[in-house]
Amino acid sequence: MSTEHMEELNDQQIVRREKMAALREQGIDPFGKRFERTANSQELKDKYANLDKEQLHDKNETATIAGRLVTKRGKGKVGFAHLQDREGQIQIYVRKDAVGEENYEIFKKADLGDFLGVEGEVMRTDMGELSIKATHITHLSKALRPLPEKFHGLTDVETIYRKRYLDLISNRESFERFVTRSKIISEIRRYLDQKGFLEVETPVLHNEAGGAAARPFITHHNAQNIDMVLRIATELHLKRLIVGGMERVYEIGRIFRNEGMDATHNPEFTSIEVYQAYADFQDIMDLTEGIIQHAAKSVKGDGPVNYQGTEIKINEPFKRVHMVDAIREITGVDFWQDMTLEEAKAIAAEKKVPVEKHYTEVGHIINAFFEEFVEETLIQPTFVYGHPVAVSPLAKKNPEDQRFTDRFELFIMTKEYGNAFTELNDPIDQLSRFEAQAKAKELGDDEATGIDYDYIEALEYGMPPTGGLGIGIDRLCMLLTDTTTIRDVLLFPTMK
């Protein structure tokens, strides 16, 4: 290590490096080797929960544990400490006369943050705390930096997000939140697997952005000398698999959108998309409700979910309402009536709804009304269906009213949690929708997509009637962990 670097270290870091060197001089590897535990902290607590001090003493049972040293007290020939593993903490009781002088020195010189292995007798203290009375201490890894001063609950938000590892060490609530996230994803997989869906993987690098209305990240493939984009959705590749006969597929994976960041948006996020042949959007509503209720039950149990003080009746059937009916109920404006674009624009002006340059159809105005007046009222789980064709380029038209599509979005607490529809499987109609999107892009709509001719070709080989779904995993995790920002459910959120 250079002298220059040593000068950058603070006193605590220098002392820890000196201890590292001392361990090496004793023939101890400061960064350890494989260590076999017989139990973790929670397993011991569960196993001995009903035994008091005397009963434990009579059983004379031993255990071998390992973890990070997070508290340490005592002096002279006796010490107490807590080791933290992934399940929690357990106390160790170390006596010099029980472990020997040389072994006691390892404990005595250990710093908070170091990893230790402990063999010993399972006991309970006079205060009733389950502990391990050490018979041998093994040094497993040296921490060269001290834990933050606010170790018992890291509070600096910037540090929490930039150095998630420190947050996980110091904040048990945060640690458990990410365990819950993992369980939510596992349970969604389990639910779909049991219904015969096949999990697949599709490309992250695309030649053309498609499957969603979003601005992509652009990159360049040097060997092929072509520009490519990071996927903004998995939709079009998954539907190619439906064409190929897979019938029931899903993918859980990262999506990338070059857009703004706020409490519910991060440039990269996790979604699940699901496609089922021979189904329509009504079937997919049932599937969506089942997925979310199963995930909620697995981590929250039966009953409603409390989110930021509001009781969400996630365990009850979700409300279903047509977009036009929802708008009429809130504003009194009836978009069921036939009207020209100019008439719709006049109504928008009267209601002070902004009209963008690329609003070329009445459907654009209808969608703007929904976003302006209805979204903020949707607290309980609600399926809003019947989106206009103009804002649904991949959805099948409703056979009874071709101004609208067989599409729905799921809203909870005013936020969109899912988007689904009866898939458009008519290649001629799909091409005309793509062309309309390309025109909107020319008029300044950054979120409009281009034309994916390869996808059109795939549809020309025939795709069965199909229902498809996309759910934002991160927002669902926010709901089920009662958190208000997406950064709290992403281990490593995007930072400046």
Curated annotation (Swiss-Prot):
Binds 3 Mg(2+) ions per subunit. Its EC number is 6.1.1.6. Its cofactor is Mg(2+). Belongs to the class-II aminoacyl-tRNA synthetase family. Its main location: cytoplasm. InterPro entries: Aa-tRNA-synt_II, aa-tRNA-synth_II, aa-tRNA-synth_II/BPL/LPL, Lys-tRNA-ligase_II, Lys-tRNA-ligase_II_bac/euk, Lys-tRNA-ligase_II_N, Lys-tRNA-synth_II_C, NA-bd_OB-fold. It catalyses: tRNA(Lys) + L-lysine + ATP = L-lysyl-tRNA(Lys) + AMP + diphosphate. It is found in: Cytoplasm. It holds the Pfam family tRNA-synt_2. GO terms for molecular function: ATP binding; catalytic activity, acting on a protein; lysine-tRNA ligase activity; magnesium ion binding; transferase activity; tRNA binding. Mg(2+) 2 binds at residue 416. Homodimer. This is Lysine--tRNA ligase. GO terms for biological process: lysyl-tRNA aminoacylation. CDD domains: LysRS_core (cd00775), LysRS_N (cd04322). It is an enzyme of class 6 (ligase). Keywords: Aminoacyl-tRNA synthetase, ATP-binding, Cytoplasm, Ligase, Magnesium, Metal-binding, Nucleotide-binding, Protein biosynthesis. HAMAP family: Lys_tRNA_synth_class2. PROSITE patterns: AA_TRNA_LIGASE_II. Gene3D superfamilies: Bira Bifunctional Protein, Domain 2, Nucleic acid-binding proteins. One of its GO terms (cellular component) is cytosol.
